[in-house]
Amino acid sequence: MKYTIPISQEPNQTFNIDLNGQRCVFEFITRGMSLFMNFTLNDRKVIDGMICLNNVDLVQYKEFDFNGKLYFTDTQGNKDPIFNGLGERWVLIYED
């Protein structure tokens, strides 16, 4: 099943969310015209400074022990996410 994770149009933001019993902390940072992510899973930082790309799984390595798929998708085309379209043009999707 697919779920949309609420995200605001801020250049830098941090939020916590529980995804299917997994404690997740997202930190998104804007550098120039690119969006980067730090990700903490169950109190263990597993990603530090990964660039966010359109339709690319953000937590793709099995050794992270993350259950599911997490990605941004462009609802109006095929561009990589930038902060001023988050939550509208670019939505953050979790698939369990």
Regions found by a protein language model. Give the residues of each.
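Acidic, aromatic-enriched beta-alpha/helix-loop junctions
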Residues: 30-75
